[in-house]
From Swiss-Prot:
This is GLC7-interacting protein 2. It comes from Saccharomyces cerevisiae (strain ATCC 204508 / S288c) (Baker's yeast). InterPro entries: CBM21_dom (IPR005036), CBM21_dom_sf (IPR038175), Gip2/Pig2 (IPR016717), PP1_regulatory_subunit_3 (IPR050782). PROSITE patterns: CBM21 (PS51159). It comes from the Eukaryota. One of its GO terms (molecular function) is glycogen binding.
Length: 548
């Protein structure tokens, strides 16, 4: 059977008619808010059959621009507004209701209302275009473990100091829809639900730490640590040295600290650790005894049985501390004798533990004489006999006082305080004012090659921070050791005034020499123990000591 291209069999035509009928039944009635225009399925049928004179054109939906004086009342029909209002009311009531089963009841009523309203608008019995909404989730529940750790907050009416969070009371707000049926998005940025929520704080049953202070609760956005790291450093220190210094952690607390201008931080920490509180009254340092103890200023007199106030006269702290250093600890005498060459052992003499004279005190290397504590002279013949290429000859302390500074009495009493001007024995601050302190030394090196470089590496804090100073050539050593082919180098340590009045100096010597073909280097570290010296700068000057 042959069929022409223009003709179609009847069975194909019947199938096309059935498909067209099904399409017409499935097409919904489209409503527009334009006056005088209504688009429905009949318009599509007429356009397809060609029986209508007017065809659907997008230009017919356009309007000329005009000034609108008042809102068009027929833009949103009353039935449509009422329908969306009822829909929002039903959603809100269902979100607050604990039983989710009521959702099916009001959805049927809302569907019936929508059906009647659409019929009144369209004038037909065809089912309207239905907006399918997702089922509402039940009210969120909090796990029991979380409830035990963070109890539920009280209502604001019962507690005046109540602080609550809106997100805790309403974890999931019900959705709100626009009049057009779209979901309304909140303009407020809510917190991520993956982060832990901050519980409500109650003043009566607050969480407290072991020391009794209220514990800091984690906030929502910004988090601060409860310990603040603090480092103390000099004004001219390098960042590398500051990074190696010790770090002090100041724990944050809610207790108010008293304002004490005359109390040192070290003394304050000692008093607080012993249970005493420091106060400052008329620039006099006094201590207040804790509860349960008698006041130290009021002592009962056994003779008359009356309490008297023992008010002591104010004395200089510098005088009291220096007097304490001379009287409290008697000089320790030792019967041990130091043998030349045995520099590996610690030296114990009458001034090893109680230095009250300004000077240098060796700890682990031999010296010829200790009559002048400001100058340490070593036995160079011992080092020369051991065929050492570099060794220390002499170490001296130089102190220069500015007479113009001390002539002015006002400047003497107004001595500036440094950040570490107080030593462990409680010496008053300001000993560095008006003084220049230097440590100078001499080094003997073997003349191997012409190019020489001698460096002294030293530290004040047990090698936590190190410093280096390069030595300067002075002359040959024929005047001291003739025929030994030695050279003399000189070095100066000029940061003595920046350390504590009783510092511990430790240093070693590095010697390198070279020519065009080879290079040699040697170390003098006192047989692997380094040179250790105690530097005392806050004691009395011995007038009988020999001039440096």
């Amino acid at each position: 059977m042959y069929i022409k291209a223009e003709q179609k069999p009847q069975q194909f035509e019947r199938k096309n008619e059935k498909l067209d009928r099904n399409k017409n039944q499935q097409l919904p009635d489209l409503e527009t808010d334009f006056k005088g225009y209504r688009v429905n399925s009949d318009l599509y049928n007429k356009e397809r059959d060609g029986s209508t004179e007017e065809t659907l054109n997008s230009l017919k939906f356009l309007h000329k621009p005009q000034r609108v004086t008042q809102m068009r009342a027929n833009r949103f029909p009353e039935e449509e507004v009422q329908r969306n209002t009822d829909l929002n009311k039903r959603i809100f009531s269902a979100g607050n209701d604990e039983n989710v089963d009521n959702e099916s009841g009001w959805s049927k009523i809302a569907a019936a209302k929508n059906h009647t309203s659409v019929e009144s608008l369209n004038g037909s019995t065809r089912p309207p275009f239905k907006i399918e909404l997702p089922p509402l989730s039940p009210k969120s529940t909090v796990p029991k473990s979380f409830q035990a750790e963070y109890p539920e907050a009280k209502s604001p009416g019962n507690d005046m100091n109540f602080e609550y969070d809106e997100e805790i009371l309403i974890p999931f707000a019900p959705p709100v829809y626009k009049k057009s049926g779209e979901l309304l998005k909140s303009s407020l940025k809510r917190r991520s639900k993956s982060l832990p929520t901050t519980p409500g704080i109650r003043s009566g049953n607050g969480v407290q730490a072991r020391d009794g202070s209220p514990m800091l609760i984690r906030s929502k956005s910004v988090h601060f640590d409860q310990a603040a790291p603090v480092k103390y450093f000099a004004e001219d220190e390098s960042p590398i040295n500051v990074n190696k210094t010790e770090q002090h952690d100041n724990c944050l607390s809610f207790k108010h600290k008293p304002v004490n201008l005359m109390v040192d931080p070290e003394e304050e920490t000692k008093m607080l650790s012993s249970g005493l509180e420091t106060t400052s009254i008329d620039d006099d340092l006094t201590t207040v005894a804790p509860k349960g103890f008698a006041h130290p200023a009021k002592i009962s007199n056994p003779n008359n049985g009356k309490g008297t106030n023992n008010t002591k006269l104010r004395k200089s702290k510098r005088f009291q501390n220096l007097l304490k250093n001379r009287t409290d600890m008697p000089p320790s005498k030792s019967n041990k004798k130091f043998v030349n060459g045995g520099g590996a052992h610690e030296i114990s003499d009458r001034n090893s533990k109680n230095y009250h004279v300004v000077g240098l005190y060796s700890k682990n290397f031999p010296i010829l004489s200790n009559k002048n504590p400001k100058s340490l002279k070593l036995n160079i013949f011992i080092n020369l006999s051991q065929n050492k290429k570099v060794f220390l000859q002499e170490l001296s302390l130089y102190i220069h006082r500015d007479n113009n500074y001390f002539s002015n009495s006002s400047s003497f009493y107004n001595i500036p305080n440094s950040h570490n001007g107080n030593d462990c024995n409680g010496v008053a601050k300001g000993y560095n004012a008006g003084c220049t302190r230097l440590i100078a030394g001499r080094i003997l090196v073997k003349n191997i090659f012409y190019d020489k470089r001698v460096v002294v590496r030293y530290t004040w804090d047990s090698w936590r921070t190190t410093h280096e100073v390069e030595c300067v050539y002075i002359s040959d050593g024929d005047g001291i050791l003739p025929g030994t082919n030695m050279d003399i180098f000189h070095f100066i340590i000029d940061d003595v005034s920046k350390v504590d009045p009783r510092g511990k100096l430790e240093f070693c010597i590095h010697y390198s020499t070279r020519n065009d073909y080879e290079r040699e280097e040697y170390w003098d570290n006192n047989n692997g123990n380094n040179y250790k010296v105690d530097v005392v700068m806050d004691g009395f000057n011995d007038p009988f000591a020999a001039a440096a």
